[in-house]
Design a protein with these regions (language model features):
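Short, low-complexity disordered leader/linker segments with a strong preference
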Residues: 1-35, 332-333
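Short, glycine-/small- and polar/acidic-enriched structural segments
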Residues: 30-180, 184-191, 206-208, 217
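Short, surface-exposed acidic
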Residues: 163-166, 268-279, 316-323
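Surface-exposed patches in mature extracellular/periplasmic domains of secreted proteins
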Residues: 70-71, 110, 168, 251-262, ...
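Conserved C-terminal helix/tail region of periplasmic/extracytoplasmic solute-binding proteins
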Residues: 302-333
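Secondary-structure end/capping motifs
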Residues: 232-312
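Predominant activation on well-ordered alpha-helical scaffold segments within soluble catalytic domains
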Residues: 24, 53, 99, 153, ...
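Pocket-lining segment of extracytoplasmic ligand-binding domains
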Residues: 96, 174-268
Length: 333
């Protein structure tokens, strides 16, 4: 779902993350800060981490008594494992990661939504005549992540096909393959797919997303921890989310400045300043629900996701929604 970056970039990203931690502790040098290891969902930084950067640089974490260390996992399948093993305390994962983990009896708990709707789908080159009606026999790109694996069966079902009717191509970068015509569609969310293709071509892509792609309208990303960590460190989880809420509000109200701050914090992320600015501007509308609230989860979102995953045979049974989440740690809004 997200563009991968080279290992050399990842090394610089880790160094950049360390410098962010250092900046957040300067103003609170005389105060004992509680360390929180935060694991991202991807091996390198991208613009969706902008609220965390804002919370660091604006001092929101420090004001809540926290020293947050950002960790980038070795691959897209490890963040949940790092939470369950204690290598990370709080993480950023997809709702499908949660569903798969809970099905495997992992003790994860989603404590806040990041986004509120499903903006994932298929993206083709500008001017393409491709539609779901002619999807059969086409080559679709996948990052090999849990979310893409979970969503593709919905797409082929919408098209009246089976997974065997398409070819799934997995590689480290989608754009060269798309531009060279070696794949017909790439898969992504609109806040990544649009700036990626626009940056490469100067034009907006042909896109089929959300309901048009047949995917359930559920949040894509959540903040998660383990049930044991949430129980033993409830005040830390609450403080973290309060700081992240402030960071999210700041980054939403100051979009250009926040995107520029991310670019400056991670100059070797592999993304351009223009990409980060456009990507973040497309992310902001996804962060609040119909009532303008951040973070709030519902039984309905988890039930809808489970119904789809059971129907497409990706999980065997659907647990009760309360198995997945709690709103008990959310700050007042």
């Amino acid at each position: 779902m997200k563009r991968r970056v080279l290992s050399g970039v990842l090394a610089s990203s880790v160094l950049a993350a360390s410098s962010l931690v250092a900046m957040s502790t300067v103003s609170g040098a005389s105060v004992q800060l509680t360390k929180v290891n935060f694991v991202y969902d991807f091996p390198g930084p991208d613009m969706e981490i902008t609220p965390i950067v804002a919370a660091q640089q604006q001092g929101y974490f420090a004001s809540q008594g926290l020293k947050v260390n950002i960790i980038f996992p070795p691959d897209t399948s490890t963040s949940s494992q790092m939470l369950t093993t204690g290598a990370a305390n709080i993480g950023f994962i997809t709702t499908s990661d949660m569903a798969v983990a809970v099905q495997a009896k992992a003790p994860l708990l989603s404590v806040a939504n990041y986004s509120m709707s499903n903006n994932w789908g298929l993206f083709a080159k500008p001017g393409s005549k491709l539609t779901l009606a002619n999807l059969k026999g086409k080559k679709l790109f996948s990052w090999g992540d849990t979310w893409t694996n979970a969503m593709l069966p919905f797409v082929v079902k919408k098209a009246g096909l089976k997974m065997s009717d398409i070819t799934v191509v997995t590689a480290s970068n989608d754009m060269p393959l798309l531009l060279a015509g070696k794949i017909d569609w790439t898969t992504s969310t609109s806040n990544y797919g649009v700036p990626g293709i626009f940056g490469a071509t100067g034009k907006n892509p042909v896109a089929i997303t959300g309901a048009a792609a047949g995917v359930p309208n559920v949040p894509v990303w959540v903040y998660a921890t383990t049930k044991s960590y949430a129980s033993a460190h409830a005040s830390v989880v609450k403080a973290f989310l309060k700081a992240v809420l402030e960071g999210t509000k700041y980054a939403s109200a100051h979009q250009s400045a926040a995107a520029a701050a991310f670019t400056k914090a991670y100059p070797k992320s592999g993304y351009t300043a223009a990409y980060n600015k456009l990507g973040w501007s497309l992310t902001v509308p996804l962060l609040t629900n119909a009532k303008g609230k951040y973070f709030v989860q519902t039984d309905a979102q988890w039930s809808l996701l489970d119904q789809g995953l059971v129907a497409t045979k990706q999980i065997k049974t659907a647990p009760t929604p309360s198995t997945y989440y709690s709103n008990a740690y959310l700050p007042a809004q």
